[in-house]
């Protein structure tokens, strides 16, 4: 994510820090994937913004979840869970939702961007190889499109940056709503 942020914010043109926001990410009973990801992004932004009430700081929080037939796939608990997730998505299309919350003083702006991802039919050999490289455990849905997990993906309909966790065009709109004009890649 740091590499994406460096590219997005011009390799130092806009300095940033990454701060953890320790919130409970357990889905609530009957919570939809969209509601879940929105709640987490807004909760993370609120927690971090509370640390800077006296400063003119822009807080950007994002959270990504994989939606497989309405079931929330967050980060896998272990390799068996990653194998289960990838096996269930193999040869199928799922949705990836990334929610972004921006807070600047008393201004707040929030959105969710979604993309559809179709996975290849994952052979046992491909599954074993991918799980063996160690990339799956810290990614929603157990794969990283921007890494070797891209080999598991057949097509993406929507924004690549949504799937990797920070949709840049919607983020630019949210920053403008909070008083900062910033165009990514400009």
Where are these regions (language model features)?
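Short glycine-rich, Thr/Ser-proximal phosphate-binding strand/loop in the N-terminal lobe
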Residues: 11-30, 108-114
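N-terminal G-site helix/loop of the GST-like fold
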Residues: 1-19, 177, 181
């Amino acid at each position: 994510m740091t590499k994406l942020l460096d590219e997005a914010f011009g390799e130092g043109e806009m300095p940033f820090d990454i701060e953890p926001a320790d919130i409970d990410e357990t889905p609530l009973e009957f919570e939809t994937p969209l509601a879940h990801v929105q709640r987490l992004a807004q909760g993370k932004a609120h927690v971090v913004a509370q640390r800077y009430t006296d400063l003119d700081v822009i807080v950007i929080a994002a959270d990504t979840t994989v939606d497989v037939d309405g079931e929330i796939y967050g980060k896998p608990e272990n390799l068996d869970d990653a194998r289960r997730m990838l096996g269930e998505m193999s040869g199928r299309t799922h949705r990836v939702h990334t929610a972004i919350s921006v807070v600047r003083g008393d201004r707040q702006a929030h959105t969710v961007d979604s993309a559809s991802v179709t996975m290849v039919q994952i052979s046992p050999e491909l599954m074993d190889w991918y799980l063996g490289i160690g990339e799956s455990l810290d990614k929603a849905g157990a794969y990283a499109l921007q890494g070797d997990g891209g080999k598991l993906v057949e097509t993406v309909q929507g924004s690549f940056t949504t799937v990797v966790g920070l949709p840049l065009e919607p983020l630019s709109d949210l920053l403008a709503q909070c008083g900062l004009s910033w165009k990514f890649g400009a």
